[in-house]
Regions:
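Generic recognition of short, well-ordered alpha-helical segments
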Residues: 94-97, 127, 162
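Local sequence-structure signature of Cys/Sec-based thiol-disulfide redox active-site neighborhoods
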Residues: 73-105
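Short Fe-S-cluster ligation motifs
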Residues: 121-135
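Short, surface-exposed basic-aromatic patches at helix termini and helix-loop junctions that form
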Residues: 101-107, 130-134
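Non-catalytic, surface beta->alpha helical segment in thiol-disulfide oxidoreductase systems
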Residues: 136, 141-170
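Thiol-based oxidoreductase modules, predominantly thioredoxin-like and allied folds used
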Residues: 81-87, 110-124
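Bacterial Sec-dependent N-terminal signal peptides
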Residues: 1-23
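Non-globular targeting/processing and membrane-anchoring segments
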Residues: 17-75, 165-170
Length: 170
C-alpha cells in the first residue's frame, strides 16, 4: 500500500504537467495551429503549420563556431534557460533551431530549459510568461542560481553562441 501511495505521489504531478505540455491554439491571423503555453521540441511536429519543417531545415544547416563552443561549454554549469517563443514567428523559426543545435552540441540538460510558446499578444495563460516582461520573440533568458544573467531578445547582436557566451561570462 505504501508503494502505491509513493508511486501515485510521484507520478501525479508528472501526469498533470504533461497534460499541459504542447497545447494547441488557432492563430487567428493565419488561421492555422500554433503552440501555446509550456512546450518542448516534440510539440513542434504536432502542429499544422510550417514551423517544424522550418525548424528541421535551419537545425540541419546551422554550423556552430567551434572556438566559441569550446568557451561556452565551460560556462554552462548551473545555468537554467527560459525561452519565450512563438511558432507563428519568423525570428523564432530562425533562432530557436540554432539555439537547440548549440545546446545539443554542448549536451545541455534540457531539463534546465523552460520553453513557453506565446500568442501574438505575447501571452500564454497558465505560465510565468506575464511576469517575464517579454515584448519580442524569441527571447532567451539565462539564469544562474535563480538570478537572471541576461537576455537575447529577438535577434542576437553577433553569433548566437557568442552572445550566450558573453551573457554567461557575467
Amino acid at each position: 500500500m505504501k508503494i502505491i501511495f509513493f508511486l501515485t505521489a510521484i507520478m501525479l504531478p508528472a501526469i498533470a504537467f504533461s497534460q499541459n505540455l504542447n497545447q494547441k491554439a488557432t492563430d487567428q491571423k493565419k488561421n492555422n495551429e500554433m503552440l501555446i503555453g509550456y512546450c518542448n521540441r516534440d510539440g513542434f511536429k504536432t502542429i499544422d503549420s510550417n514551423f517544424d519543417s522550418a525548424y528541421l531545415a535551419e537545425y540541419k544547416v546551422y554550423r556552430t563556431d567551434l572556438a566559441t563552443m569550446k568557451l561556452l561549454s565551460q560556462k554552462l554549469k548551473g545555468v537554467n534557460v527560459t525561452l519565450v517563443m512563438a511558432t507563428w514567428c519568423g525570428d523564432s523559426k530562425e533562432w530557436v533551431p540554432r539555439f537547440y543545435k548549440i545546446m545539443d552540441e554542448l549536451n545541455f540538460n534540457h531539463k534546465k530549459l523552460t520553453v513557453i510558446c506565446v500568442d501574438r499578444e505575447k501571452k500564454a495563460p497558465g505560465t510565468i510568461a506575464a511576469g517575464l516582461n517579454v515584448d519580442k520573440v524569441p527571447t532567451f533568458i539565462f539564469y544562474r542560481k535563480k538570478t537572471e544573467l541576461g537576455r537575447i531578445i529577438e535577434v542576437p547582436s553577433d553569433l548566437l553562441e557568442k552572445d550566450i557566451t558573453v551573457i554567461l561570462s557575467k
